[in-house]
Amino acid sequence: MTVGLGVDIVEIARMRRVMERTPSFAAKVFTEAERAYCDSKANPTTHYAARFAAKEAVCKALGTGILVDGMRMTDVEVVRDSRGKPTVALHGQAAARAKDQGVLDIPLSLTYTHSVAVANAVAITEASQVERERRRDVKAELAQQFKEMRGMLDDLSSTTAHKADEIHGQ
């Protein structure tokens, strides 16, 4: 895999119904830190829905589903960096899968409206970095070849002009 992309959308009302019907749902699906974060918000269900969408999006970016090959929902955790930006922390089978695929990073984007939460995740791999460097090298090589050709054309032009001057006796 060069780059994996995952997108998921969750209806907030549906998340609310699931959490009301199954009180143990949050403990099975979200880490303690995720639950503490969501529960600290004015509208916890919105944040639970965004994190659920993130877990699904990350698994899609890794090329698998949740609950596949022993992966648990809590193996994908949404944490916040020092600036408050949501990022991904992988554990267990999710971390093993990412390592096997050479995943270096999984940038994450979360957003929501009054009715839905959406997450987008991109699994950036070693192969994608190598490909980017290769493309950069190709561009540099083409630029160098262009300069060399331009120099040859300039030389040819001045040589041709000099020969023309000789022929016309100047």
Each language-model region and where it sits:
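Core catalytic alpha/beta fold that binds nucleotide/phospho-ligands
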Residues: 1-5, 9-170
